[in-house]
């Protein structure tokens, strides 16, 4: 059976593993999931990730990050644009997550980037998710 929203599945796997305080989570890979993982790593929400080629779709392995006393670095992840209801924003209308404490992940013509990068490049796009 095919999956309706693979991005939501990936974000849910990361959220659930984070809540259960797992060190590693695996999900089926895709280019957009790899881009999302790169953003999460660059913004300091995860330790690292790796792509594992299994001669099929591939697997993306995400290494979660925790603070002192195993406090969660990712407080929340929310999928915004869904297959049944896409959400787009112009460059000047891009949302700020928790007044700049979180990030919005945006799919633009310049690739998958954060809301801060999209504002500086003056590009809008599809608002994939919020992470805080």
UniProtKB/Swiss-Prot annotation:
It comes from the Bacteria. One of its GO terms (biological process) is translation. SUPFAM superfamilies: Ribosomal protein S8 (SSF56047). The keyword RNA-binding applies. GO terms for cellular component: ribonucleoprotein complex; ribosome. GO terms for molecular function: rRNA binding; structural constituent of ribosome. Part of the 30S ribosomal subunit. Contacts proteins S5 and S12. Belongs to the universal ribosomal protein uS8 family. One of the primary rRNA binding proteins, it binds directly to 16S rRNA central domain where it helps coordinate assembly of the platform of the 30S subunit. This is Small ribosomal subunit protein uS8. It comes from Leuconostoc mesenteroides subsp. mesenteroides (strain ATCC 8293 / DSM 20343 / BCRC 11652 / CCM 1803 / JCM 6124 / NCDO 523 / NBRC 100496 / NCIMB 8023 / NCTC 12954 / NRRL B-1118 / 37Y). The lineage of its organism: Bacteria, Bacillati, Bacillota, Bacilli, Lactobacillales.
